[in-house]
């Protein structure tokens, strides 16, 4: 039996409130008006608030003289009944607006309103006015209930204080937490801005398979599934890389995809089993040019969405305007570990001794490249606060990257780190089919040795390379982490509408 989180039980007073609301719904059913669907909305709260924001120009008299009549709908977020007149507040996707309700104008609808509950969805029609406190209001001439809410919203002063409940019941979180709603609006704008940036530079958006015959494109453990009709095991993709590079072989020289990847790995504040990636490839580009592209698309996206290139993320003030630092991995390791010499960086036995001294656990199968990466992750990664490209990774940990022409054992690869977190990974692509086949074979041997994240041998991809792939640069940007950066979110779950959670019992 798998471990499950117990389903939260509503308190007794909440149960009684639900029972009362169900009784009200029963009365509406008896009248045949439980869930009407004939109201046509014409106006939004946010648009009205923006249009009539100037209280000096739009006085109550000016609003009445305008003759504007609005038809709106939204969720009832507050109500204040005061005898013959009442106030209410409704919320739609754009914001909130106040309603001014009069019994002598609304008649039976006003009587019905007194029995409505916060959370109900209502429709209103009327003119515009402004209260003595200066608040824009809809002076209702017609009012009706569209949807009866059966569950009470959280207390307005405390909201959803249970973080896990916020993630499980995102639909409630979006209703009562404006900050959460704003994060997901920004997420949409970020993705839209990146698409526009790439489209303007002649990149072609494509769609590649989500289920793969052979998992590949990244060193990660895949999810498996089974196609019944074909009696065939398949894998949810860990990355679209090998399919996108097949398209470059086919002559689509600038391609990108923004879509989901799936990796059967741990869950943390930075990791979710399914996540969104931007992956792109450009023929005749080197990893230096791809670093330039990475820097510019992130900087321009921030400016487009936020209006600034300065952000605060998890306690750090980040400036995206200056040129991003570029630092070789071995140099960064030596800078933070003066006892490691240049010769040590490619000496397996020396690196093993350093790992032992640093209390870094390693496996017997690790070569010097993997050991160097382990030391980097343990001693350097968390120190990279301002945007930094770590470059020239060892071949051992870069099975798809082009080998360096000047540094044996290293590759033309980079990773971008901001505030100790990896946001992007790219390289000059390996387009030598014989070298690629040899690296695939090394990955197969690593898998046979117990490395669950090692790649499989993809013979069809080798065949594609044998037709010839132009010199190419590639890039992957973690959209979820980029959204975290640009919204100041500290957990990946805060930028995923429905993050992975253990099922409720």
Curated annotation (Swiss-Prot):
Its cofactor is Mg(2+). Disulfide bonds: none annotated. One of its GO terms (biological process) is lysyl-tRNA aminoacylation. The keyword Magnesium applies. Its EC number is 6.1.1.6. SUPFAM superfamilies: Class II aaRS and biotin synthetases, Nucleic acid-binding proteins. Mg(2+) 1 binds at residues 415, 422. It catalyses: tRNA(Lys) + L-lysine + ATP = L-lysyl-tRNA(Lys) + AMP + diphosphate. GO terms for molecular function: ATP binding; lysine-tRNA ligase activity; magnesium ion binding; tRNA binding. GO terms for cellular component: cytosol. Mg(2+) 2 binds at residue 422. This is Lysine--tRNA ligase. The lineage of its organism: Bacteria, Pseudomonadati, Pseudomonadota, Gammaproteobacteria, Lysobacterales. The gene is lysS.
